[in-house]
Amino acid sequence: MSLNLDGMVIPKHVALILDGNGRWAKKRGLPRTMGHKEGCVTVEKTVETAARLGIEYLTVYGFSTENWNRSADEVGALMQLFRYYMVRLLKVAKANNVRVKMIGDRTRFDQDIVEGINKLERETKDNTGLTFVIAVNYGGRDEITRAVKRLAKDCASGRLDPETVTESTVASYLDTAGMPDPDLLIRTSGELRLSNYLLWQVAYTEFYITDCLWPDFNEDELKQAIIAYNKRDRRFGGVK
């Protein structure tokens, strides 16, 4: 029987670190690429569940700036999987009224992948349900570096007075501009680190770590995280 969330506060924005695809495959004597494929299936199911539960923003760490350091074969397989997954995701998004947004530096991808990303965003931009955000070629430090460069150029050109720069100004230059910061960050596979993910945005985010490997993540795992979130006393640096 599925867990009951009656009376619970549903976090507006949930961020996910999808860890454990490779270990999931290794445990079953399968190549790592099979773990990534199964992980994509879990992403689809999680998008549908999040939309149904009333979560407004779901952000997943799809491919980090550091992932380029993996073997050429694995990176190539991930790019092929990304191409395939974008086609499937468009169908899932349209069926569930989901708006898709990509964050990260897309300039390193092949042109057909960039065009696929643009198509996903363009054809779902008017959907009014869940906003599904995928971080691709993304790193928190890289995001902040790119934001600072743009901000510095605007200051140098006179378009921005450096004395007026606030935290909100900096946030407006980030990839996530216009989005609320995550309320809840879930990391699978039991690892206790951020892995260069949303470093600015998670300043006051509640963390939930589960030993579950990402391909095994399901609706009850998500609900367990929401239940744990409801037991937290969010102070945002203050005292209650």
What are these regions (language model features)?
Residues 1-240:
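Flexible, compositionally biased loop and terminal segments
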